[in-house]
Amino acid sequence: MSSPPEGKLETKAGHPPAVKVAGIRIVQKHPHTGDGKEKKDKDDQEWESTSPPKPTVYISGVIARGDKDFPPAAAQVAHQKPHASMDKHVSPRTQHIQQPRK
């Protein structure tokens, strides 16, 4: 395989086109530059630092205390599939398939 020319790179949809080897298209993946990620991280930190205070939640006229009222273990039990109290007894039935004679 030949390396792409260092000068002007031909791009399609913002990335270099795939290379054909033995009739199969092979995509060459190159690592991205880290400059854009650093800028995004700085912007994310600014938004995270200015979060509004959590509103108080009232349940039946009483202030909810969050995890103290509803522990995570209780929430897990509520979302688990209920088990059957009686096991299903499947009676073995022979299935007869009627077919025409030869």
From Swiss-Prot:
Residues 92-102 have a biased composition (Polar residues). One of its GO terms (biological process) is apoptotic signaling pathway. Residues 1-102 are annotated as: Disordered. GO terms for molecular function: ribosome binding. Residues 32-43 have a biased composition (Basic and acidic residues). Phosphorylated. Phosphorylation by MTOR inhibits the suppressive activity of DAP toward autophagy. Keywords: Acetylation, Apoptosis, Autophagy, Phosphoprotein, Translation regulation. The modification Phosphoserine is found at S3, S49, S51, S91. The modification N-acetylserine is found at S2. The modification N6-acetyllysine is found at K29. The keyword Phosphoprotein applies. Belongs to the DAP-DAPL1 family. Ribosome-binding protein involved in ribosome hibernation, a process during which ribosomes are stabilized in an inactive state and preserved from proteasomal degradation. Acts via its association with eiF5a (EIF5A and EIF5A2) at the polypeptide exit tunnel of the ribosome, preventing mRNA translation. Involved in ribosome hibernation in the mature oocyte by preventing mRNA translation, leading to ribosome inactivation. Ribosomes, which are produced in large quantities during oogenesis, are stored and translationally repressed in the oocyte and early embryo. Associates with ribosomes; inhibiting translation. Interacts with eiF5a (EIF5A and EIF5A2); inhibiting translation. This is Death-associated protein 1.
